[in-house]
């Protein structure tokens, strides 16, 4: 895991109420384009990285982006190694038993992607006998195991979504399930465009898929939560959110 921290300078002068120490904002160390991934120089780039900078500036906080392995990101938060999570983490009842969340900052559908020309629907019947690849320790693992576990040949787990995508291209799995934006990015690549297509959105289950994506926070950190909520609200209200989103997405991903 990279130990180099990418510092996002919120150049506004900190007010007296601002936090004295930089806020360590955890992102997943595994690449998750277009939200966060390292460029050729090893710098973390992407929509979520840009949003962290904008939200922290709007809230007059100095923030440090800190890559953490996805499967250890909540323990890193609760143990104090990081102060917040902005890593496309869905707000679910299960997670809220352990941590708190800010207001949502995006909400997009969950979809199934499979090979072109293969009849497939995004439900248990359509995925019967199929090998479905999902990223481990995600809402997609929980959903696939709950809804497709009895009918699918296998729910195959991957450390990263990129690995699942590569196996789909190679024909080692029959389908993958993930956030629509992440899979749109895959389908925009040469390999993805050649092999695969969206088969449809899965039926929503907010208990598993959550109520949008928010900033993960330790319970009891009410002041920090208020700062993130204020920063999110400000970048949405002043148009910064849409300005940041425009290079990445054809339409708003804020959702309902």
Language-model-derived ranges and their functions:
Residues 54-58, 66-67, 71-83, 98-100, ...:
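Short helices/loops that flank or line small-molecule/ion binding pockets
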Residues 35-38, 52-61, 140-158, 165, ...:
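Ligand-binding cleft/hinge of the Venus flytrap
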Residues 62-64, 139-155, 197-198, 229-256:
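Ligand-binding clefts/hinges and TM-proximal coupling segments of bilobed small-molecule sensing domains
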Residues 49-59, 118, 126, 130-131, ...:
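Extended ligand-binding regions for polar small-molecule ligands
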């Amino acid at each position: 895991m990279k130990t180099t921290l990418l510092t996002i300078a919120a150049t506004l002068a900190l007010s007296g109420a601002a936090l004295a120490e930089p806020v360590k904002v955890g992102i997943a160390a595994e690449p998750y384009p277009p939200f966060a991934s390292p460029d050729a120089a090893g710098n973390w780039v992407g929509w979520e990285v840009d949003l962290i900078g904008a939200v922290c500036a709007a809230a007059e906080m100095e923030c440090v982006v800190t890559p953490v392995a996805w499967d250890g990101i909540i323990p890193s938060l609760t143990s104090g190694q990081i102060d917040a999570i902005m890593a496309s983490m869905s707000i679910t009842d299960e997670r809220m038993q352990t941590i708190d969340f800010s207001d949502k900052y995006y909400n997009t559908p969950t979809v199934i992607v499979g090979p072109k020309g293969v009849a497939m629907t995004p439900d248990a019947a359509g995925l019967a006998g199929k090998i479905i690849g999902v990223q481990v320790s995600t809402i997609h693992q929980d959903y696939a195991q709950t809804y497709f576990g009895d009918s699918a040949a296998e729910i195959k787990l991957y450390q990263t979504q990129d690995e699942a995508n590569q196996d789909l291209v190679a024909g080692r799995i029959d389908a993958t399930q993930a956030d629509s934006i992440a899979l749109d990015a895959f389908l925009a690549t040469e390999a993805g465009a050649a092999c695969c297509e969206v088969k449809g959105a899965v039926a929503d289950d907010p208990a598993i898929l959550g109520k949008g994506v928010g900033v993960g926070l330790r319970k009891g950190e009410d002041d920090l939560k208020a700062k993130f909520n204020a920063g999110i609200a400000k970048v949405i209200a002043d148009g910064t959110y849409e300005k940041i989103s425009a290079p990445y997405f054809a339409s708003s991903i804020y959702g309902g």
